[in-house]
């Protein structure tokens, strides 16, 4: 006879199964029958834990947003050694973020949240809006300061971009690179891979922000150049 899981454990099991189904099919096309089958329970038991698909979706979002915070955290600007070297802050942020995106499978990063983001973008956008607002709220002020410092130091030139716009451009590049690396064999025909692809992405977006090649080269992590 199969052992009955405690209520809390069963709830977590349902949320985990639902996350996989929502990520694969999106909110609109996912069904409670599919979720119940993935969780290996009856639809009736599913409704004992969650009164509706909407309630279950909200529970999944609350759970996955914590996992996605790990990736969002790599977009945070940090001050190396307590200095006000804006270029160094920006380059380290780009390096950390693109490394996390490109090495997702190698580092065993849980990409369920990212798959759900893609499904949300193809659907009603609820989760995508939540994630983008959350990421911006956490990072935009530090990014703005780093951009200002880099410009004041002469490392960043050209048209001034709003920090929110810069953050969105960077996220879009990283997000698509992560998307192409979700499978065991990357689907995008990049000429480079691994650490070299990270380096090229840093130079690409660093130049887009207005950083000079000299500033990027000077501040790129020495053991990764």
Task: Kindly give the residue locations of the regions a language model identified.
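Helix-turn-helix
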Residues: 2, 13, 21-63
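Helix-loop "lid/cap" segments that line or gate small-molecule binding pockets
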Residues: 96-107, 115-123, 204-210
